[in-house]
Each structure stands twice: as structure tokens, then as C-alpha cells.
Amino acid sequence: MMASLSCVEDKMKTSCLVNGGGTITTTTSQSTLLEEMKLLKDQSGTRKPVINSELWHACAGPLVCLPQVGSLVYYFSQGHSEQVAVSTRRSATTQVPNYPNLPSQLMCQVHNVTLHADKDSDEIYAQMSLQPVHSERDVFPVPDFGMLRGSKHPTEFFCKTLTASDTSTHGGFSVPRRAAEKLFPPLDYSAQPPTQELVVRDLHENTWTFRHIYRGQPKRHLLTTGWSLFVGSKRLRAGDSVLFIRDEKSQLMVGVRRANRQQTALPSSVLSADSMHIGVLAAAAHATANRTPFLIFYNPRACPAEFVIPLAKYRKAICGSQLSVGMRFGMMFETEDSGKRRYMGTIVGISDLDPLRWPGSKWRNLQVEWDEPGCNDKPTRVSPWDIETPESLFIFPSLTSGLKRQLHPSYFAGETEWGSLIKRPLIRVPDSANGIMPYASFPSMASEQLMKMMMRPHNNQNVPSFMSEMQQNIVMGNGGLLGDMKMQQPLMMNQKSEMVQPQNKLTVNPSASNTSGQEQNLSQSMSAPAKPENSTLSGCSSGRVQHGLEQSMEQASQVTTSTVCNEEKVNQLLQKPGASSPVQADQCLDITHQIYQPQSDPINGFSFLETDELTSQVSSFQSLAGSYKQPFILSSQDSSAVVLPDSTNSPLFHDVWDTQLNGLKFDQFSPLMQQDLYASQNICMSNSTTSNILDPPLSNTVLDDFCAIKDTDFQNHPSGCLVGNNNTSFAQDVQSQITSASFADSQAFSRQDFPDNSGGTGTSSSNVDFDDCSLRQNSKGSSWQKIATPRVRTYTKVQKTGSVGRSIDVTSFKDYEELKSAIECMFGLEGLLTHPQSSGWKLVYVDYESDVLLVGDDPWEEFVGCVRCIRILSPTEVQQMSEEGMKLLNSAGINDLKTSVS
């Protein structure tokens, strides 16, 4: 290690050199930074061959991620000292002086990252050149000298811990069948026995030849000839691990990992532990004072934790969540087969690890306890950036989280700009070093208003205020939704057979039918005088309803009625100056004109789209735009009802959220096919004498006010099913969709099941496999329905944080009330689950598709048939997923988003 850098050190006039687990070189010469970097590159390129990045990362482990060259990081001297302590097996003593001018975390820019591997032991390590900076503005433009750009983990590999027979001189190496079939070339099983020669390379580009044979009773894959030579040359013993990978060039490579063994005696040439600790601190302090680059060596297998943290990761952990005692968290650990597994725990304390030397340091300032009893090898202190909090796991769901099968690219004949936009999440935590959003959300999707809505703690009364705020933005034209639509919204299709011309007005006969009577009431109510600010929105909303209902000629009466309502309302606004301002009337007239007059907008990239593709995308786009409006008032002689707009049935939300579209081809996205899929867009009215509000009570999970109706077939409900308390399934479907979207998916992290606190492994899978067999097409073919397939089981487990899980038989209860009462008695929560609105406690369950839903949302028979486990959430757990972690976005991210929207 030292010999390879001697020439560089002479030319750079090195003033400080420390060997061991943490080697640091501080440069004090007057040569420029570019010359030093060129020297480093020349020396590393001439002295050593280039290390294969994928094999290096496979040996390092799945959790290791090196920073990119040119990025900003935080360097923690405490973590570097821990690496020195592990290599010397001696911690720092009181003889190590304190450096008050050295901060606990030092902001640096990464100038170089070089991968290394020891020739004798194959121990891997990385050399990093760090430049201290005062702030993000001091970033130096780093040229590309072919240095490491980012971490490359292999996609195809397997890792096995060697047994005694694997390291014997006559046994050979047993390869798992799946690994052999996946990585090795196919065997000729017609030969007796099937054999082949494998040529693999290691980290040092050495070539090894193994004989791969399929034999034994039972038969298994073995590496025989050449394996003993490999074991002897690498000095492998039982407990060490061997990895086989295929890199991006499809080359077969092999690597080794040494098991941690106690070292009997340290070599006499190694410096004392105190000297090495002093060298780490002194070199870092000197580089900080003089703003000169310094070198560090990072050993991922020996180091307890990473001490070079990317700036974005640090800010996301420190500023993106408010950690508190009692908070639940998850943390990833490496498994024996080089996989990843999440362990769950609880924060029991927040304090400085070393208050004397490093007061206020974030390094391992969290005291934790693990759920599982066999976690003695897990650390009792962790850093905030090492854990995953509930808000980081669940609060940023992807817009496509409802899709259980991705649409095949061939359905779209090439991805368009709109297709790429709907695949992006609406909100993402900034990954850039300066905290700027990587891209702005699409303005016409009302991202600003959506962000504001999501920043607030949930309250059902926030929905009218949110709608009023959007209405004000629309009327005033402050870069609101309608203003953006004028500039960016693609217009309606040019298919006359599917268009309702404004000249085609239909006179509704009041005595024709009940449906016609309802349509007449709708027309009369929309023509009735209203408040000034609501008049404008009603006209615009009617235009959106007209577009949303324009699915086929079979619904021509409803569509034409809505068209008449829209035109009459616009005429009323133009004839009554007292009811609205000219600006309001002009906006409504423009929007109405946009619906009937197709135009082209090359800005959004729709000029070269096919007619059918444009039809589908425009229909979804305009329906989404109509989903952010205040509920308009429908009044009749005996009743008045506030009905939600057509957001509940907007085609875009079905296109994006609804799993029922996964098996459809692209040509089925036309309005005529949407009629078959979404027949629920028939808006019915109730003639009851009471005043009803179509605003079902929603849970206080995030995204309650921004969702689509899922698995709803309104054809099975009579007239009046959409109003007030007459539609219980409406609220249930909204509740189920919201809960599933809020809990099931995350853009930044993987999905996970709830941990098993009652014993067993308690594993939390990082990847959830979904069952696609639940989608069936009915005999008529007019709609898609999700059929709950009953699963054979005996008991259902009920889990609660901090308590031992219980098992119950849900079939022994008659309804939800009995179930909740029994669970309350089991866990001593009398009255908390039966009155969730006042207590704040939530009872959720996981179905056989791994969707997390609220208990009570679905019919009892369906719940009994699909429940897999039940989970009790305390008010703290519920609030953490909806409120915490948003303060940073509310203060910093929203400003950037406002600028991009306006």
C-alpha cells in the first residue's frame, strides 16, 4: 500500500503520513489541484490494473455505496477512528489530544475515488481524496480522468460461506443448483457425466480454471479440478465466503471474503493505536485549517459504519424527520448470502456518544433497542442516516404505486413525454447536494396545491378550504390550474364521431323518464343564481363534467345536458356583470372554447402523436385537471346536495392508480373503451328531503384528499348511491385506496410487511410479491372486478408495537364490532378501537395481496376471506406517517416548487 504511493508522496511533498486502518495524507505543496489529481491517476493507472467495480462491490457487500466523484459529503472523524480501532483492536485512550478546531462533521468535496485490493489477502478498500469546503458554493469543477463515477453492484451473483468439505483437498466446491443454472454456461446433460470448463477472473485479473461437473447421488453441481489450487493460493478456510458474479460484459468473475478472526499478535512494524488515532485527527484538522485535500482509506468489510456520508443522505435524515424517543425505525443489514434484510427497533434515547470530545455530534447519537431477541450482534447506537423512519418508508408513495404489473412498453409504441410524466412521483425528497428538486412536477397537475394540501395534518374540514384556495387561484389567474391549461394542456381529439358539437343542443322532456328528469334538474340547478365566486367555478366544473361524461354516444343525453348546462352558465355569466367579473367570465369562456376547438401545442410534444394516442392522453389529462375543483351545488325543489366533482372518476387516476388497467392494450384507452371500464361515471342524485354532503370521512393518513376510486362498480347501485350516507361502499373504497397507497409503497424505499413481534423471525421483506391472479374479467366483459379468493388458514395474527402478538379466529366473530371489542380486551385498549375518531388509534390489516387496509372498510365477508394479519397502530404511529418529515419540505421544498409552477 505504501509503496504504491511513494512516488506520488514525493512529488506532492507530503507532510503527514499515517499507516494502518485509517491512512491519511495531507498535501501542503504549491502545485495545483489538477496536477495532483493527474499524478494520482497516473500512478494508480501505471502501478496497478483497474479493479473491476462490480466484483469489488460484490466483495464489499450490498449495503456499501461509495460517493461519486465531484459530490459533496460529510466526513466524520469519529467514524474514521472507529475503523482504526477495529484494525488495531484498540480504542482511543486519554492520551489522544483533543482538536477543538476540528468539527465533528467536515463538509468535503470528493475529488477522487480509487478501488484497491490487497494482493495477498484480497482485502478490498477504497482510496478517497477529499477537499474541505466552507459551503456548497465552494465546489470545485472536477474534470473526468476516467475515475470511478458511481457504485456498480452486480445484478447476477451468488455468495456461499465455505464449509469444511468445500475447503478440503478432495471434496470440491458444491454450487447451489439455481446459482449454477443462472451464472454458469448451460451444461450438456446428454453427456455422461455432464461437464464443462469454467474460466474465471479475480480482482487482480488472475485467471482460474475450474471443472464444472454434475454428478453424485443425489446429483449436484460441483467444481472439482482447479478448485483445490484456488483454495490453497487464496488460503481459504471454513467460514470464509466465495462469490461468483457476471459483470456488465457477461464475464464470469470470482471474489473472496475473509471471516473476521481474532489476530494473535500485531506486527511489530505497525504503529501504536494512539499514534494512529492522533494521525487521523491531526491530518483532518490540518486539512481543515489550510483547506487542502487529504487522502483516506476506507475498508468496508472492517469498518463498523460508513464515515463518509453523502450530503443529500445526511440532510434527508437530519432535516427530513424529527427523531424522538419511542419512535419506531427499520435498519438494513447484510445477510449471509450477501442479501439485505430489514430489522425493526425502537429509539430509546438521543444523546452524544462522546460528549467531551465531540459535543453535539450526530455520529451514533441514537440509542436503540431491537425487536428480536437474537440481535446481540447489532449495534446499540446508530446514526440517523443509517435508519429508516416511518415517514421515510410510507409518506412518499409513487404515483404508480397501485400498479401491480407494469404496462408493457409495446402497448404505447414508444414512450412519450406524457407517458414519462405520469410515471414520475409527484413528490420526491431532494437527492441533489443543494437540496433542489431534481425536476419540477407538471404545472397543469396542480402540484403546488397538492403540495400545500399534503403539508397539512389531515382534517376533513381542510377539503373545502383547499378547494376555495384553488378556486381563488383560478379566478385571479396567479399561475393557477386554468392558466396553465391555456398554455400547456393538449386539446380534445379531432374525431367528430366522438365529439359533441356546441350547436347540437337537446331539449330534455321533463316527463320522458326518471333519468331525463334528473338531467333536467341538473340543468335547472346549474342555471340557478349562485354566489359570485362559485358561479365561475360552477361553469368551469360543468365543462369538465361534460368532458368527463363524454365517453360514448350511448350517453349522448347526459353529455348534451351537461353541454347545455355549461353554455347556459357561461351565457349567464356574460349577461350578469354583478355575478362575476369579466375576467372570470372570460376564463370560463376560454375553457369552454378549448373543449370544442381543438388546437395543437408543440410545447408538450403532442404534435406528432397519433390520433388515438392523443385522444387517450388528452382525455386523461383534462379529467385530471377537472379533479381539483370545489364541489358544486346541485339544488332541486326538495333537497340540496353538495356533490364532489368528477375527480372520483377521472380517467387519469384510473390509468395510473387502478390495477384493473394492467392487462389492457393501448387501443383500449379510447373514450369508448373507457365507457366500458368506467361505467361508474353516471352521476346520480338523491331526491331525499335532507341535505347531504358527498364527503365521506377519510382517515388521517397522508394523501386522503388526493386519490382515485378503486374497484367501484356503480352499475350495481340504484339512483342516489352517490349522495351522503346512502353510499357506504363509496367511503370504503376511498378509504381502502388511500390506506393502500399511503402504506404500501415508497419511492425512496422498498415495500415491507409489518414485523412479527410475537416470535419467529420477524422478518420484514424488502420486496413484496403481489398475486396477480385476483384480476378476473366477468362474463359480460363490460368491467373488471377484483375477486377475493379465500385463503385456507386457521388463525389470524394480531400485532401491536411493544406487545406480544396474539392469534384469533376471525370467522368466530359476527361483525367488526365484536372483532374490535375482542382485540381491545386482548391488549387492554378498551374503547380505543371502537371509537377511532376520538382516540386516534387505527386498526389495519394486510390482505393476501400484501395491501394494507383499514379494518372496517370492506364488507365483513370479504374481510374474513382475505385478511392475513392485523396490526394495531397507536396515534403516534399514525401521526408520524402523516405529519413528521414534512416540515423540511414545507419550508424549503415548497418554495422551489412554487417557483417552478408559476
Curated annotation (Swiss-Prot):
Residues 497-543 are annotated as: Disordered. Its main location: nucleus. Coiled coil: none annotated. Residues 793-877 form the PB1 domain. Keywords: Activator, Auxin signaling pathway, Developmental protein, DNA-binding, Nucleus, Transcription, Transcription regulation. It is found in: Nucleus. GO terms for biological process: auxin-activated signaling pathway; embryo development ending in seed dormancy; flower development; leaf vascular tissue pattern formation; longitudinal axis specification; meristem development; regulation of DNA-templated transcription; response to auxin. The keyword Hydrolase does not apply. InterPro entries: ARF_dom, ARF_plant, AUX/IAA_dom, B3_DNA-bd, DNA-bd_pseudobarrel_sf, PB1-like. GO terms for molecular function: DNA-binding transcription factor activity; identical protein binding; transcription cis-regulatory region binding. Expressed in the whole plant with a lower expression in leaves. Detected in embryo axis, provascular tissues, procambium and some differentiated vascular regions of mature organs. The keyword ATP-binding does not apply. It holds the Pfam family B3. One of its GO terms (cellular component) is nucleus. Residues 158-260 bind DNA. Belongs to the ARF family. Homodimers and heterodimers. Interacts with BRX and the auxin-responsive proteins IAA1, IAA12 (BODENLOS), IAA17 and ARF7. Auxin response factors (ARFs) are transcriptional factors that bind specifically to the DNA sequence 5'-TGTCTC-3' found in the auxin-responsive promoter elements (AuxREs). Seems to act as transcriptional activator. Formation of heterodimers with Aux/IAA proteins may alter their ability to modulate early auxin response genes expression. Mediates embryo axis formation and vascular tissues differentiation. Functionally redundant with ARF7. May be necessary to counteract AMP1 activity. Absence of the protein probably causes early embryonic lethality. Premature stop codons are associated with vascular defects. Interactions between auxin response factors (ARFs) and Aux/IAA proteins occur through their C-terminal dimerization domains III and IV. PANTHER family: AUXIN RESPONSE FACTOR 4-RELATED, AUXIN RESPONSE FACTOR 5. This is Auxin response factor 5. It comes from Arabidopsis thaliana. The lineage of its organism: Eukaryota, Viridiplantae, Streptophyta, Embryophyta, Tracheophyta.
